[in-house]
UniProtKB/Swiss-Prot annotation:
GO cellular component, one term: ribosome
Protein's UniProt name: Small ribosomal subunit protein uS8
HAMAP family: Ribosomal_uS8_B
Source organism superkingdom: Bacteria
Pfam families: Ribosomal_S8
Family note: Belongs to the universal ribosomal protein uS8 family.
BP terms from Gene Ontology: translation
Oligomeric and partner information: Part of the 30S ribosomal subunit. Contacts proteins S5 and S12.
Gene3D superfamilies referenced in this protein's UniProt entry, alphabetically: 3.30.1370.30, 3.30.1490.10
SUPFAM superfamilies xrefs: Ribosomal protein S8 (SSF56047)
Function description: One of the primary rRNA binding proteins, it binds directly to 16S rRNA central domain where it helps coordinate assembly of the platform of the 30S subunit.
Organism: Frankia alni (strain DSM 45986 / CECT 9034 / ACN14a)
Amino acid sequence: MTMTDPIADMLTRVRNASRAYHDSVVMPHSKIKTHIAEILQQEGYISSWHVDDATLAGGVGHTLVIDLKYGPNRERSIAGIKRISKPGLRVYAKATNLPKVLGGLGVAIISTSSGLLTDKQAGKRGVGGEVLAYVW
């Protein structure tokens, strides 16, 4: 069966692994997932990520491995993560109307003509785009 929303699958895997206090989470690799992981690392929500060759483990293609981040007393760095624009209902935002997550404490991941950006980066560049997810 084909996957209709790989971004939602990625976010769900990260959310579930974080709630279960796993150290890392493995998922199929794609360029957009890599860019989302890069943004999550830049914003301090995950500790690191890397791409493994799945053919060594008997799989096909590459896998993305995300190492989750916790505080000194195992507090989760990701309190919540939510998919906004879905295949059935796309959500777009203009540069003048970019969303703020929890009054600026969280981050919105936006797909723009300049690539994937956070809401703050898109505001500085003056570009809008498709609002993929909120992370707080």
